Structures are given as structure tokens and as C-alpha cells.
Regions:
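ABC ATPase "signature
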Residues: 58-59
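C-terminal boundary and immediately downstream tail of ABC-type ATPase nucleotide-binding domains
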Residues: 65-92, 108-110
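Walker B catalytic motif
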Residues: 2-3
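Helical segment within the ABC ATPase nucleotide-binding domain
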Residues: 13-26
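A short, surface-exposed alpha-helical micro-motif characterized by mixed small hydrophobic
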Residues: 40-42
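Conserved H-loop
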Residues: 27-33
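Helix N-cap at the start of a conserved alpha-helix in ABC-type nucleotide-binding domains
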Residues: 9-11
């Protein structure tokens, strides 16, 4: 329980390395309780998110990050400041396409301009996944959706409620 919470980053890395080795060499399942998302990202293959003493999310770590629900987004503490005009599209890049040039290919293929609002790549255990928010003109949304579906990218249109809550920040 909270095995790494009071440790410096180097000691935390050493502890996580030891736990990985124990898991790999001895085949022992390790249950790690932590509030540190970097620890979860660095070692977990599966995770459970508790909220109010109840399981609110569970599954393999990559799926939890590629399909985050409101509880997961809240836990991650990622506030998105989003433009109020245009259409904001949140993209999730699975490991198979995390390093592909999907966005530049899309801009060239569709011959459109759009804004990249924010983005990042994250290492989750042995996988790398990406997330990105783009803002496009309403007239281009259907073409963008078709392109990103065909590219193997998971996406969601950001709701008006999310924009209003972020615009008030």
C-alpha cells in the first residue's frame, strides 16, 4: 500500500524495477495500491480505479487510457482549455499507431487547416499511447472522422458541456 509515495524518484524507479523483476522471474502477481499515476503508468498491466470506496473503472491499462470515462479524466486531473468556436475532437492513438504521422497525413490528404490544441505521448508499462485534441471547422468534421477511423485512431467529439466548463476557467 503506497509503497513508493514517500520516496525520491530514483528510489521509486529502483523499487518498480525490483517489482517488475519479481513479477517476471517468479510469476508472482503484484497488487500495488497507489495514488501516483506515474507509478501506475510505469508498472501496471491492469488497474482498478476506486471512487467513494467502489470500483469505478477497471481493465487493462492501455484501454483505461484510450477510453477514459469522466471518473478517469477526473482522476488524471487533466483540465483541457478548449476553444469555444469550431469543433474539438479528442483523439486517442493506440500503441500500433502512436508514432505514425496520422495528423500530417490527414492535413495533406484532406487539404484542410486545423488547430492542435494539445497533445502528448505516454508510456504505459511496455506500451506507448498518444492523445491529442484538435479543433476543426464544422464543415470538415465528417471528413476528419472518416479519415481518423480509417487510420485506427479512437476519437470523440468534445461535448458543449465540456467546452463551457473549460471556457469558464
Amino acid at each position: 500500500d503506497e509503497a513508493t509515495s514517500a520516496l525520491d524518484p530514483n528510489t521509486t524507479a529502483q523499487i518498480l524495477s525490483l517489482l517488475r523483476r519479481i513479477n517476471r522471474e517468479l510469476g508472482i502477481t503484484i497488487v500495488l495500491v497507489t495514488h501516483e499515476m506515474e507509478v501506475v503508468k510505469g508498472i501496471a498491466q491492469r488497474a482498478i480505479l476506486l471512487k467513494g470506496g467502489r470500483v469505478s473503472n477497471s481493465g487493462d491499462i492501455v484501454s483505461l487510457f484510450l477510453h477514459p470515462d469522466e471518473n478517469m479524466k477526473e482522476f488524471l486531473g487533466e483540465e483541457e482549455v478548449l476553444p469555444a468556436s469550431g469543433v474539438n475532437i479528442r483523439l486517442f492513438f493506440p500503441p500500433a499507431v502512436a508514432f505514425d504521422s496520422v495528423i500530417t497525413h490527414m492535413a495533406r490528404a484532406l487539404e484542410i487547416n486545423f488547430n492542435i490544441v494539445w497533445g502528448k505521448l505516454e508510456r504505459l508499462d511496455k506500451n506507448v499511447v498518444g492523445s491529442l485534441v484538435i479543433n476543426v471547422e464544422p464543415a470538415h468534421v465528417a471528413r476528419v472522422e472518416e479519415f481518423i477511423k480509417n487510420a485506427g485512431v479512437i476519437y470523440e467529439i468534445v461535448s458543449e458541456d465540456e467546452i463551457k466548463s473549460c471556457a469558464a476557467i
